[in-house]
Every structure is written in C-alpha cells, then in structure tokens.
Amino acid sequence: MLNDLDSIHQTDEGLREYLRSRGNRSLYRYRLTLESPQAPRITVSGREYLAFCSNDYLGLANHPELIAALCEGATQYGVGAGTSHLVSGHSRAHHLLEEALASFTRFPRALLFSTGYMANAGVVTALTGRGDAVFGDKLNHASLNDAALLSRARLSRYPHLDLATLERQLAASPARRKLVISDAVFSMDGDIAPLPELLELCERYDAWLLLDDAHGFGVLGNQGRGSLAHFNISSPRIIYMGTLGKAAGVFGAFVAAQEEIIETLIQCARSYIYTTATPPFLSHALLKSLELIAGGAGRREKLAQLTKLLKQECHPLRWQLLPSDTPIQPLVMGENAEALQVSEALRQKGILVTAIRPPTVPEGTARLRISLSSSHDIEDVMELGAALREIDRDME
C-alpha cells in the first residue's frame, strides 16, 4: 500500500526519506532467507531456529509423499504449463484437481487460481462493478479489500464481526448486485467468522457471500473440509475460496461455487484469463495432499492439543493471547517497538516468531503472530512458553 507515500516527492531522495520514516516508526519489513525446508526447526544464516511463523498447519510442506508426488508429476507433465488455461495450459492434472476440490468441498465446480490474492481479485471484479455494492469486515485480508477497490463497486466496511451494522448497510443499499466478502478465519486474529449468521443475512437481502477460507481449509471441519463443514452449512449463494499453500502444503488457490459462477469466472476473471497456468506437477502433488488432509484427523487433534497447551503457557504473561481456537494465536503487545523487541529477544534464544505491525493490523495492536503446526512437539510449545516468560521478567 502506498497511502503513506502521498506526501513524498517522486525522487530517489523522497523514497529514501520515506524508507527512513518507516524505520523510525518500527514499520520496516525484512525478509529471512531459509536454507532448509519448512519445518518446526529451520536454518537461517547457518543457525537453527525453532519456528512459529509458518502457515504449514498440517506439516505437509516437506512431507515425503508430497515430494514423491511432485517428482512423479514433473516426470509426467514437465515443469511448466507454458501458457494460460484458456490457450493450451490447462492440463489433465489441473482438471483432475479441480474435480477433486469440488467434490471435497461439496460444490458443483471448482476453478484453480495461482494465488489466493488472484482468486479474490478474480471473483470480486468478475461479479461486481459500477452500480454494485460490496460489504466487507474491517479486518478482512488485504486481498479482499484490494479486490473490492479494483472492482469499482461501492465498498462498505463494517466493524469486525458487527453484523448489526452489516444488516443496516445491506438494508439501505439500492444496488442491483450485492456481495458480502469475509475471511472465514481471520488471518491475524485467528477467530472464526459467524458463517451461519452471515449466510442468513445474505439470504435475507439477496446477496452473494464470498468466504476466504485460506486458514480454515484443511484445518477445520470433518476431514479438514474447511469452515463450511465446521458449521455444517451450504448454500448456492456461497462462493468459497481456499488456498493450497498453507494447510495443503504446496501452492495455489481455488474457488468453489455453482456452475454459473465458475463459468462466469472463466469468461470474465482477468486474474484467471491473463496469466500462465500454474505448473501441472503442483496439481498432481495436490491430489495426494487432499488424501493426506482427509486422513489427517490425528494432525488436527494434535493442533487442538498444542493450542490448549500454548494458552496455558502464555497465561502468566503481561501480554494476552486473543481469543482463538485455531492454530493462529496472536499475542498482542500494542506498541510496534515492543513487539519488535520481544520478537528479537526470542530470536536471540533461537526462536522465530514474526512481529506483525500496522497496516497489517490496526494501529496500537502490534503483536506476535504465533502459528502452530501439527509438526510441533509439546516440548517445542513449552520451550516457547518458557522463553516468553523469561523475556517478560527481563522487561519488568
């Protein structure tokens, strides 16, 4: 986002001043360079760290069966799609995965996208435009917000989980088409949206409901089928977006919906039409990933156990975990500098937990986003808890 660049002159010195300003406000972002696969223990710059910052919730990103399936897919399909899905880039592997995803999520059709960001952009811009209305939770993922702005529909945002305000907005809207957009599991808070109530409002006010289940797919519901299965709800109004690089362990995203919605996306979603298809070997590997997700009840049970343990370990701290029953456990410090200080203190102890600051989260809510994986052990969580308590004492 370039909002805070508005007052900066279009010169190299202007950009340097902007970057200095970000550093002064404890908002500068840095990248880590991993030298190992994703796992509870990773190597960065030659040092091993215990990591709590990946979205690899089921520990599949380095699973031997997925690695074998990926190699098998590369042998069968090569390493690149070569062109877009609508030219000659749509392979049998893509097609089989779309059919499997539709069946797994209990929708008539599914459509692959390269990323969740592109999937959300494709859906919102294909289905809405000038004269239409989009309604979104203020804590939605940036991709949903950007998609709504790109569509040129009127965007109304409601306070987090404030369905009374959403209902007033829906009731007052004269738009010909209405679309409610929401995270199913909020990526920085870890809480789950009240999907039955959201759906009821969409039914009452004749709106579509786009759910971004990037952090629920594979984790929630029977066999990991996601947030809809968690609540046991379905409706032709629902447009379901799931990602394939988090719990699924590989890469990509998909949209599942009614036949007419999917066909409209194929015809009109620019982020689907005007891009090269993902390598087909990824889709081949993801077919195996779906099998592992469906059979991963033990992994999901372990996640629940680790989540309960982490809450116990963090209970004595001055900082509080936000209420969340998902693997996303945010420990809120408030000030940017303090979140960075605690993150760095953990790093000195060989533990990686990312500090999340504005604009990713609202001002005054900087936090550590602790992310659990079923690959973590009980001892890993206890080590993190002990380190946090020691840092807490040292900062008194």
From Swiss-Prot:
Name the record gives this protein: 8-amino-7-oxononanoate synthase
One term of GO molecular function: pyridoxal phosphate binding
Keyword vocabulary terms for this entry: Biotin biosynthesis, Pyridoxal phosphate, Transferase
Residue positions, PTM N6-(pyridoxal phosphate)lysine: 246
Organism: Nitrosospira multiformis (strain ATCC 25196 / NCIMB 11849 / C 71)
Pfam family, one: Aminotran_1_2
CDD domains documented for this protein: KBL_like
Name of the encoding gene: bioF
Amino acids binding pyridoxal 5'-phosphate: 116-117, 187, 215, 243
Disulfide-bond pairs as recorded: none
InterPro entries in the cross-refs: Aminotransferase_I/II_large, AON_synthase_class-II, AONS_Archaea/Proteobacteria, AONS_Proteobacteria, PyrdxlP-dep_Trfase, PyrdxlP-dep_Trfase_major, PyrdxlP-dep_Trfase_small
Description of how the protein assembles with itself and partners: Homodimer.
Family label: Belongs to the class-II pyridoxal-phosphate-dependent aminotransferase family. BioF subfamily.
Function as written in the Swiss-Prot or TrEMBL entry: Catalyzes the decarboxylative condensation of pimeloyl-[acyl-carrier protein] and L-alanine to produce 8-amino-7-oxononanoate (AON), [acyl-carrier protein], and carbon dioxide.
Binding-site positions, substrate: 29, 141, 360
Listed GO biological process terms: biotin biosynthetic process
Catalysis performed (reactions): 6-carboxyhexanoyl-[ACP] + L-alanine + H(+) = (8S)-8-amino-7-oxononanoate + holo-[ACP] + CO2
Pathway named in the protein's UniProt entry: Cofactor biosynthesis; biotin biosynthesis
Cofactor: pyridoxal 5'-phosphate
EC number(s) on file: 2.3.1.47
